[in-house]
Amino acid sequence: MLPIRDENPTLRPPVVTYGIIAANLAAWVLVQGMGAEPALSHSVCSLGLIPGELMGRIPAGTSVPVGPGVTCRVDQPGHPLALLTSMFMHGSWFHVLGNMWFLHVFGNNVEDVMGRFRFLAFYLLGGLAAAAAQVLAAPDSAIPMVGASGAIGAVMGSYVVLYPRAGVQTFVFLGIWARMMVLPAFLMLGYWFLLQLLSGALAPSEGGGVAFWAHVGGFLGGIVLTPLFLNRRLLAEHKAATGLA
């Protein structure tokens, strides 16, 4: 399933959502060289999160291959700042554009009822919850973790809490069969969450390069954090104007 747009208007410009998208794209272009080597591998090595390094499970000085002819040299102790910087690093054009598209579709409505500063704090804490989940699931992993997926998972978890009945125009495809459908948010995002949960349970802890448990942790973190960051006045305004929430 690929969400195209939701049928859920906003009352205010999503300044923070657009700012986060701009920051991720700027990091991809200016820091990661748009995926060109050696900038990509060096950025993943220096700014990505290596669970085993953070947890002290990998011996200092260990070399971890991350790209063609590029290795990460593990330091001890691992730098906690990687929990934050890893949210703004990506592995490919598909990775960064896919993540930013999901944030574009769902982030504006969550920001609309939290307010800008609360939403920014929520997004970052959701990303930290996602990183913590992946580290706990694979504490010995030497594979660098990068991407905004966990933080965006938190946004999607919040969206389900706030707008379960909102329609989401979704491109649904199965083999050669494809169709555009309007699905309720709880169904579209519930399917996404179930897919991450099953993939995390059935795949190795390192997920073949996909941090499934970060997605799960982010989604659940978003559900838990939403009541703490929700602005009741903004929610009431949104509900009065749209009939949703």
Set out the residue ranges of the language-model regions.
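A detector for small-residue-rich transmembrane helices and their helix-helix packing motifs
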Residues: 1-245
